[in-house]
Amino acid sequence: MTERIPPELQTQLVKLQQLQDQLNRLLTEKNVIDSELREVNKILQELSQLPAGTTVYKIVGNLLVKTDKETVQKELDDRKEILELRSRTYQKQENLLRTQLEDLQKKVNELLAKYYPQSGGAIKA
C-alpha cells in the first residue's frame, strides 16, 4: 500500500521544483550572456591593436559590410555595456533565487520531519 504525500508537503515540493527549474533557466541565459560578453571583449582587444581609421568588416545577416574601426568599436562598447548590465541583473536574480530555494528547502525539510519523523526528513537540492 502506498502512502499519500500530504497536500501541504506536495504543494511545497511543487514550488521547490519550479524554483529549481527557474534557476536552471536563468543560469542557462546567464551563461549565454557571459559567453557573448567574453567574445565582445576579445574582439575589442583585437580592435585596440589596429591603427585608427583602419577599415574593418562586420557580418550583418548574410552580408559582409565594410566599415571603419571606430564605428565597430563604438557599437561593441555599447553592446558590452548592455551585456554587463544584463549579467549583473542575472547575478542578482540568481542570488535571490538561491536564497528562496534555501528557505523553501528548509521548509520542506521541516514538513518532512513533521510527516515522516522516522526517516530523518532531510533532503538536499
Swiss-Prot record:
GO terms under cellular component: cytoplasm; prefoldin complex
A Pfam family annotated for this UniProt entry: Prefoldin_2
InterPro entries with a match to the protein in the record: PFD_beta-like (IPR002777), PfdB (IPR012713), Prefoldin (IPR009053)
Keyword terms: Chaperone, Cytoplasm
GO molecular function: protein-folding chaperone binding; unfolded protein binding
Homology family: Belongs to the prefoldin subunit beta family.
Protein name, per record: Prefoldin subunit beta
Protein species of origin: Sulfurisphaera tokodaii (strain DSM 16993 / JCM 10545 / NBRC 100140 / 7)
Encoding gene, per UniProt annotation: pfdB
